[in-house]
């Protein structure tokens, strides 16, 4: 996806991906994470239930949220246990090794017995924002991959905006391999990109 920042009047407006997840090992291998000066968010989410905000968090990673998460009315005790079980089962998830039948994310969550309430208040708004869709119909395997990484990593932002990420990655790429303002119109032989200016 697109990653960048617009700098205007001392404000930073990030475009494309809004946070950096520290668990994505491939991205970490492409840049020096220390160079982009990450600032971290606490694990969890602040959710509005129609009346007021409540916090749902991972007490295993943020002990300060233990009681607020345990006694939150956003989800039943059963849902909380199912989330912890899902986190445990997907802790070392590999999408390449997943031999289970694929289905939509919403079907997967329903098959695991999550209540409609926790799906509507947590899973749908959180993952719809990631998948860019309303009803989380995205592949359950991709959901498991994303859930696993969010369970292990932390959401973070570079101190001077998301633009620091492509800037850092580009330092390790030869200048003649970077094409700016060029539209891709096709892929040839699975490894050659064709641009609209007829260059390959």
Predicted regions and their residues:
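Helical element adjacent to the flavin cofactor pocket in flavoenzyme catalytic cores
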Residues: 142-191
């Amino acid at each position: 996806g697109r990653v960048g920042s617009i700098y205007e009047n001392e404000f930073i407006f990030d475009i494309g991906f809004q946070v950096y997840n520290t668990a994505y090992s491939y991205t970490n291998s492409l840049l020096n994470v220390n160079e982009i000066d990450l600032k971290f968010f606490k694990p969890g989410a602040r959710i509005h239930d129609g009346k007021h905000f409540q916090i749902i968090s991972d007490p295993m990673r943020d002990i300060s949220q233990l009681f607020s998460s345990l006694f939150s009315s956003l989800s039943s005790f059963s849902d909380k246990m199912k989330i912890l079980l899902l986190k445990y089962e997907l802790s070392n998830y590999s999408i390449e090794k997943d031999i289970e039948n694929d289905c939509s994310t919403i079907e997967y969550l329903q098959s695991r017995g999550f209540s409609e309430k926790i799906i509507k208040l947590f899973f749908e708004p959180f993952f719809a924002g990631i998948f860019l869709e309303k009803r989380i119909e995205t592949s359950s395997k991709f959901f498991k991959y994303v859930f696993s990484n969010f369970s292990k990593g932390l959401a973070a932002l570079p101190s001077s905006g998301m633009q620091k990420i492509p800037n850092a990655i580009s330092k390790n790429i030869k200048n003649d391999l970077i094409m700016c303002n060029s539209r891709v119109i096709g892929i040839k032989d699975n490894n050659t990109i064709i641009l609209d200016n007829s260059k390959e």
